[in-house]
Curated annotation (Swiss-Prot):
Residues 446-483 are annotated as: Interaction with KCNE1 C-terminus. It comes from Felis catus. This is Potassium voltage-gated channel subfamily KQT member 1. Residues 149-157 are annotated as: Interaction with KCNE3. Gene3D superfamilies: 1.10.287.70, 6.10.140.1910, Voltage-gated potassium channels. Chain C (1.20.120.350). GO terms for biological process: action potential; inner ear development; intestinal absorption; membrane repolarization; membrane repolarization during ventricular cardiac muscle cell action potential; potassium ion export across plasma membrane; regulation of gastric acid secretion; renal absorption. Residues 496-532 form a coiled coil. Glycans are attached at N200.
Length: 582
């Protein structure tokens, strides 16, 4: 980054004054602009109130005389303001020169201001009789005062906001107005057909024409209800009541649409403003993160911003007597700032510059001093922090005072940067990164209570979804009947799907398996005894093989088909009956 400095702060030029005046009048920001424009609005409002009072007989004399002097003051004030606005517009390039001023004067609000000023001057010069206005002049003054109310909103923000809301919701507004207009003309026509021959109590026909019916329809569907025209027959009243409910509902919809549109527009502006505050914080975070990454890069371009270009007037060794260290440091700092075009006491945006004390070749390495002084670090927030001067030496301080001080030499090349310089720069960059990260996190926080509530509701909804999913899996694991099972199946298996019932079935199956294993063991023993040719229950010969304990006589029921091993379906389907475990 290359910083360009000026010798001193420039004086206020003509264009600068024009710019400040133009921003004050045309782009009001701040409490001073608010006070000024609000005072102008109050003056115009008071003048309008006096013009209203001039129509009341009790206050004619007081209001007319006061209104005369107020009009003179307002004409002079608005005329002067118009000239100042025309002059200050020259700060912008498109309004420079005569043609630029004419372009500024062709703006609608400028035309209205000019008309008000000229018309007020004409009324004051022609329509006044002494210190009061004529009756015809007062009528013109009232109209001009109404036009002055447009002066309050010179930027047209109100009209732009209304236009944007109408444009966004144009489809809904067109639909409601179209349907409401159809309801109006149909209701008016049917009421006219029913009431065209009806006579009221005074003997007059209220709905003598279709125009009278349309007037009644407009007054009815807009919920004004003057009561000047009322249906007389029951047929007309029935038609009017039916169509009124339908038409009034559609004529009331545009108000709700515009209200919701304004609310959404305000919320959108707040979100955009909150997002705009995040952009500088994000850019600063990206910049500091990149600088931290670049600090690990050995390329010279990373460190060039900390190197000061050499000056011609700078000499390493001065033949003059060396001043004391404190005086020398102050003069050196003033000289370096002056060389860079920075006046004393002026805060500018710079990068840290590093200076060091040159080491003489004759001096031994054991006796050297490194002075990292005058490294003024100025952050982007224009806060100047001057580092202290560290002196490292293993000699006595008195010897240094006797020997004098070596003038500090700014680092003019990347190769002169030492390891402690690079380490310091890395630490500073790391600190700047953490500060930028904290600011970005603060900028990301919700700006409104509604956003906090919305985030809480969204988090609560996600939590409930996860809880329901966990409950579903738990029900599936413990055997709870699903939602798609019919009511009859639920009532049939109400007690068999609990954990206790399932454990009981498992225990029953284990007992059945134990009995089957006992039967299988008996069958194997019987088969083994028959294989050796002995009577059932006799011992086999001891010529080898396993010794089998004798058992009782052969049970013929063991070989029945019913004693076969149970199938998978028999093990899974529970038996119902008192002898299930036998």
């Amino acid at each position: 980054r290359v910083s360009i400095y000026s010798a001193r702060r420039p004086l206020l030029a003509r264009t600068h004054i024009q710019g400040r005046v133009y921003n004050f009048l045309e782009r009001p920001t701040g409490w001073k602009c608010f006070v000024y424009h609000f005072a102008v609005f109050l003056i115009v409002l008071v003048c309008l109130i006096f013009s209203v009072l001039s129509t009341i007989e009790q206050y004619v004399a007081l209001a007319t005389g006061t209104l005369f002097w107020m009009e003179i003051v307002l004409v002079v004030f608005f005329g002067t303001e118009y000239v100042v606005r025309l002059w200050s517009a020259g700060c912008r390039s498109k309004y420079v020169g005569v043609w630029g001023r004419l372009r500024f004067a062709r703006k609608p609000i400028s035309i209205i201001d000019l008309i008000v000023v000229l018309a007020s001057m004409v009324v004051l010069c022609v329509g006044s009789k002494g210190q009061v206005f004529a009756t015809s002049a007062i009528r013109g003054i009232r109209f001009l005062q109404i036009l002055r109310m447009l002066h309050v909103d010179r930027q047209g923000g109100t009209w732009r906001l209304l236009g944007s809301v109408v444009f966004i919701h144009r489809q809904e507004l067109i639909t409601t107005l179209y349907i409401g207009f159809l309801g109006l003309i149909f209701s008016s026509y049917f009421v006219y057909l029913a009431e065209k021959d009806a006579v009221n109590e005074s003997g007059q026909v209220e709905f003598g024409s279709y125009a009278d019916a349309l007037w009644w329809g407009v007054v009815t569907v807009t919920t004004i209800g003057y009561g000047d025209k009322v249906p007389q027959t029951w047929v007309g009243k029935t038609i009017a009541s039916c169509f009124s409910v339908f038409a009034i509902s559609f004529f009331a919809l545009p108000a709700g649409i515009l209200g919701s549109g304004f609310a959404l527009k305000v919320q959108q502006k707040q979100r955009q403003k909150h997002f705009n505050r995040q952009i500088p914080a994000a850019a600063s975070l990206i910049q500091t993160a990149w600088r931290c990454y670049a600090a690990e890069n050995p390329e010279s371009s990373t460190w060039n911003i900390y190197v000061r270009k050499p000056t011609r007037s700078h000499t390493l060794l001065s033949p003059s007597p060396k001043p004391k260290k404190s005086v020398m440091v102050k003069k050196k700092k003033f000289k370096l700032d002056k060389d860079n075009g920075v006046s004393p006491g002026e805060k500018t945006l710079t990068v840290p510059h590093i200076t060091c004390e040159p080491v003489s070749e004759k001096r031994r390495p054991d006796h050297f001093s490194v002075d990292t002084c005058d490294s003024s670090v100025k952050s982007p927030m224009l806060l100047e922090v001057s580092t202290t001067h560290f002196l490292r030496t293993n000699s006595v301080a008195e010897d240094l005072d006797l020997e004098g001080e070596t003038p500090l030499v700014p680092i003019t090349h990347v190769s002169q940067l030492r390891e402690h310089h690079r380490a310091t720069i890395k630490v500073i960059r790391r600190m700047q990164y953490f500060v930028a990260k904290k600011k970005f996190q603060q900028a990301r926080k919700p700006y409104d209570v509604r956003d906090v509530i919305e985030q809480y509701s969204q988090g609560h909804l996600n939590l409930m979804v996860r809880i329901k999913e966990l409950q579903r899996r738990l029900d599936q694991s413990i055997g709870k009947p699903s939602l798609f099972i019919s009511v009859s199946e639920k009532s049939k298996d109400r007690g068999s799907n609990t954990i206790g019932a399932r454990l009981n079935r498992v225990e029953d199956k284990v007992a059945q398996l134990d009995q089957r294993l006992v039967l299988i063991t008996d069958m194997l023993q019987q088969l083994l005894s028959l294989h050796h040719g002995g009577p059932p229950g006799s011992r086999p010969p001891s010529g080898g093989g396993a010794q089998v304990q004798p058992c009782g006589p052969t049970n013929p029921e063991l070989f029945l088909p019913g004693n076969a091993l149970p199938t998978y379906e028999q093990l899974t389907v529970p038996r119902r009956g008192p002898e299930e475990g036998s």
